[in-house]
Amino acid sequence: MSVAVGIPYVCFFIILSVVGIIGNVIVIYAIAGDRNMRKSVMNILLLNLAVADLANLIFTIPEWIPPVFFGSTDWLFPSFLCPVCRYLECVFLFASISTQMIVCIERYIAIVLPMQARQLCSRRNVLITVLVDWIFVACFASPYAVWHSVKTKDRNTNSLRFKLFQLSATCSNTVGKSTWWQGYKLTEFLAFYFVPCFIITVVYTKVAKCLWCKDPTLQCETRSCLDNKSSSRSSDALRTRRNVVKMLIACVAVYFVCYSPIQVIFLSKAVLNVTIHPPYDFILLMNALAMTCSASNPLLYTLFSQKFRRRLRDVLYCPSDVENETKTYYSINNTSIVGPRASFN
């Protein structure tokens, strides 16, 4: 990789990692540091998503440092970190994807089935679901820990790069293209890409239809049947719900854009047996897109959620005043529950 190409990649990966790490740390602090916000089921899921995204960004750093800085796939770190990093990277990636699916199902129940929401989406049920999800992804990703190790390769030991960094090995899969590994990768493709994409798209489409088409309150905004107070509340609900829909669409769009290209390459090579040799720069770009998904969620919260922007100002400027505030939580269904609760949505 030439210097002209390498420098932009270095800057891009560094900026992406820094922005993603700082953004997710702020989300974690904003929720975990506020007792009122921790009472919201939705915020528990957002906290879980931020933890998974933050850890995923951290454990992908050993993956992109060698190719971005040195133009190779050499492993720079102790050998035992190869299977550990690869395993944890996949665990947190799978947890991030599955948490997004849990979030969309929770939103569907809260919006489309509000009468069942209190029972189905209780704090206890959500915590159990999150725990089961982490156990599942930890078990599912275990082949990465078992079948990855550092492979020594022949290198020119007289080169300056070898003398400085001892670049002579790669962290790679030890079973190659065995049938069972291809079957595992196909299962991974279905479980953590195709099925989540299908469920998220279908569920959020139904949520959007419910918000835009089926709620008579949204269509009553300008009618004379509402008094001024009710009209104002309806207008506020309309604006809130529009922002929710925009955020849901943005999440789905980012998910597709970030993961579709690299999954198409995998499907073509592993399943359809199509011979593809994309340029190495293209592979780096695909990995950068995958990282972008983990880094973008805090930006989406800031862009679409007024409550998150308000909480962000509290964290950055007046953290001591947050606990003294009594907040009102407005549910997504235009039903207000007065009390010490807060949510980003």
Swiss-Prot record:
Disulfide-bonded cysteines: C82-C171
GO biological process: G protein-coupled receptor signaling pathway
Gene Ontology cellular component terms for the protein in this record: plasma membrane
Extracellular compartment residues: 1-11, 62-90, 147-187, 268-281
Traits of the deletion mutant: Increases the likelihood of dauer diapause in L2 larval stage animals. Reduces the level of daf-7 secreted in the ASI neurons but has no effect on daf-28 secretion. Does not rescue the absence of dauer diapause in daf-3 mutant background. Exhibits broad pathogen resistance with longer lifespan when feeding on live pathogenic bacteria. Shows both reduced avoidance and reduced learned avoidance of pathogenic bacteria. Does not affect pharyngeal pumping rate and defecation cycle of young adults.
Alphabetized Pfam families for the sequence: 7tm_1
Membrane topology: Multi-pass membrane protein
MF-aspect GO terms: G protein-coupled receptor activity
Transmembrane segments: 12-32, 41-61, 91-111, 126-146, 188-208, 247-267, 282-304
Cytoplasmic side: 33-40, 112-125, 209-246, 305-345
InterPro entries (alphabetical): GPCR_Rhodpsn, GPCR_Rhodpsn_7TM
Primary location: membrane
Tissue: Expressed in pharyngeal muscle and AWC, ASG, ASE, ASI, and ASJ sensory neurons. Expressed in ASI neuron. Expressed in AFD neurons and in AVK interneuron.
Keywords for the protein's UniProt record, in alphabetical order: Cell membrane, Disulfide bond, G-protein coupled receptor, Membrane, Receptor, Transducer, Transmembrane, Transmembrane helix
Record's subcellular location: Cell membrane
Known role: Probable receptor for neuropeptide ligand nlp-8 that plays a role in octopamine signaling and specifically, the octopamine inhibition of aversion responses in olfactory sensory neurons. Plays a crucial role in daf-7 expression. Acts in concert with gpa-4 to activate TGF-beta-like daf-7 secretion in the ASI neuron, thereby promoting larval development and inhibition of dauer diapause. Suppresses immune response against pathogenic infection by inhibiting transcription regulators elt-2 and hlh-30 in ASJ neuron. Promotes pathogen avoidance behavior via intestinal gon-2, independent of aerotaxis.
Similarity-based family: Belongs to the G-protein coupled receptor 1 family.
Protein name: Neuropeptide receptor 15
Name of the encoding gene: npr-15
